[in-house]
Every structure is written in C-alpha cells, then in structure tokens.
UniProtKB/Swiss-Prot annotation:
This is Glutamate--LysW ligase ArgX. It catalyses: [amino-group carrier protein]-C-terminal-L-glutamate + L-glutamate + ATP = [amino-group carrier protein]-C-terminal-gamma-(L-glutamyl)-L-glutamate + ADP + phosphate + H(+). Disruption phenotype: Cells lacking this gene require arginine for growth. GO terms for molecular function: ATP binding; coenzyme F420-2 alpha-glutamyl ligase activity; metal ion binding. Substrate binds at R192, I203, A204, E256, F257, K258, G259, F260. Belongs to the RimK family. LysX subfamily. GO terms for biological process: L-arginine biosynthetic process; lysine biosynthetic process; protein modification process.
Length: 282
C-alpha cells in the first residue's frame, strides 16, 4: 500500500501530513508537480491514494485528473477541485439544493457589473469566481470605487477575472467561521476574527483564530453542503447572517489548517491520514 503526497510548494501543512504518514507507518512518495512531469500511463497506478496538496488550483486539478486516469483514488477528486475552485459553480450547486449563500448577482461585463451594483446597493462585495486568500475581493462603498475596480479587472489577462460576483456585504459579529470536514465527519470549526486594520477575516491577511461552540444548525448546514460538493477533505467558510442564520461563502479543496489547529488543538494531519488508512489502505 502506497500513498502519493502531491505538492508544488511544501508548507507547514504538507510537512505535518508527511509526519503523520510516517507515524502511521505508511509508505509514501512526495510528488512535486512544479518539478516533475506527470505522464498518462499506468505506472502511476502503483499508488492506492493520492493526497492532493498543490497551492495552484490548476496544478491540483490536473494532477488529480492524471492520477485518476491511472486508477488512483485522489483526495480530493478532480470533480471536487473543479467545483471548489470556481465560486460560481459552487454557489450554483448549493443554491439549487437550498443551501443558504450570500445574496449574489453574476455580471459578465463592465456594463453588467454597473447594473449589478445599482441593483445590490452599497456597500457591496465584488469578487472574481477564482482566487484564494482574499485576493481581488473588494469592498465597494460607492460607484466611484466600483468603476475603479471594474477598470482594473478589465485589464487583467485571465477572462475569469473579468467576471464579477456582486454580493451583499455581511459583517455580522466581525468574523467568519471556518470548518473542516473529513469524509462525512465535521472535524470542528473556529472563528476567524477580523483585525483592526482589515475588513477581511483571512488568516493570511491578519485574521486571528478563536474557539467557538458548534451548534446543531452550523453542523447540519456544513455537512449538507459538503455532501452536495462531494469533498473528502475540505474546509468551508461560513458567515453568520442576521436573517439567514448561516450562509456558505466558500469551499476550499486544498485546505490550510494552521489556524484551525491553533484554535481547536485538533491534529488535522493525523485525522486525515487516519481516515486514509482506515478507508483505503486496509
């Protein structure tokens, strides 16, 4: 039984996963897709499971797809990565199944974005369908800021960045909630608190973690949403809403978990490797 740990940049999380694989005495290889090519051949089938960890969404997606072609079980699957990597696709799946999401309008041109701003009213959020760590997520307080954002986005080469997700601005309790699910189990949740010099709660932007109590509604919402998206190891960003209770804002298919471990004292890497061993390496 052998595991592939697929990376492009080795962060603390990947080091912890490797350490857990060694602790559980599982044979594994690290495949760095930023340095090594992945051929379409059956030789990759020597791996029973691949843990997909590239930072780049496209590297993660394509690595998962190539390994799947050789019969390798990937965590996460290319289908899951594709869904999580595009916020519009994520919202579409969730909204169809009745999962609360932020009120959103999709605008596919500059003119459409201006009309969406008018419909939504200020302040509002404008973000592209792709991206992580809060990049290009804009809080727009008036039409002048909005026009500036639209002009800048139009100059970007990637067509997806010219698509606008225009959303209500939610700032209830000045925090958001991040949860981690492994398999069908909610591992836990913690709050990401907005720092004084930011309006976003991302840990990468200075947000700081704290413990929270997970109530039944939060657990129910997160697990139902995860069953729709289909991820085996995902983090879910949740916002507390004054009228909707909990809304799902985003799924992450290659979850970072330093902040989660700090807030909850749960060893995520060991939980993940235990799940892999118990479900796929018996």
């Amino acid at each position: 039984m052998r595991v592939a740990l697929v990376v492009d940049i080795v962060r603390q999380e990947e080091k912890l996963i490797a350490k857990a694989l060694e602790k559980f005495q599982l044979q594994y290889d690290v495949i760095n897709v930023a340095q090594e090519p992945l051929p379409f051949n059956k030789a990759l089938g020597r791996y029973d499971v691949a843990i997909i960890r590239p930072i780049s969404m496209y590297r993660a997606l394509y690595a998962s797809a190539v390994l799947e072609s050789a019969g390798v079980h990937t965590i996460n699957s290319s289908d899951t990565i594709s869904l999580c990597g595009d916020k519009i696709l994520t919202y579409s799946k969730l909204y169809r199944e009745g999962i609360p999401i932020p009120d959103s309008i999709i605008a596919m041109s500059s003119d459409a974005a201006l009309k969406a701003y008018e419909q939504k009213g200020f302040p509002l959020i404008d973000k592209p369908p792709i991206g992580s760590w809060g990049r290009l997520v804009s809080l727009i307080r008036d039409i002048f800021e909005g026009k500036t954002i639209i002009e800048h986005r139009e100059l970007m080469g990637n067509s997806a960045l010219k698509v606008h997700i225009v959303q209500e601005y939610i700032n209830y309790k000045s925090r958001d909630i991040r949860c981690i699910v492994i398999g069908s189990e909610l591992l836990g949740c913690y709050a990401r608190n907005i720092p004084s010099n930011e309006w976003r709660a991302n840990i990468a932007l200075g947000g700081y973690p704290s413990q929270i109590e997970v109530d039944h509604k939060l657990k129910e919402t997160v697990l139902k949403a995860t069953s729709i998206i289909g991820g085996e190891f995902v983090s879910i960003d949740v916002m507390e809403h004054q009228s909707k209770n909990y809304v799902i804002n985003e799924f992450n298919d290659v979850p970072e978990f330093k902040g989660f471990m700090l807030a909850t004292n749960i060893d995520v890497a060991e939980e993940l490797v235990s799940y892999v061993k118990n479900n796929y390496l018996r």
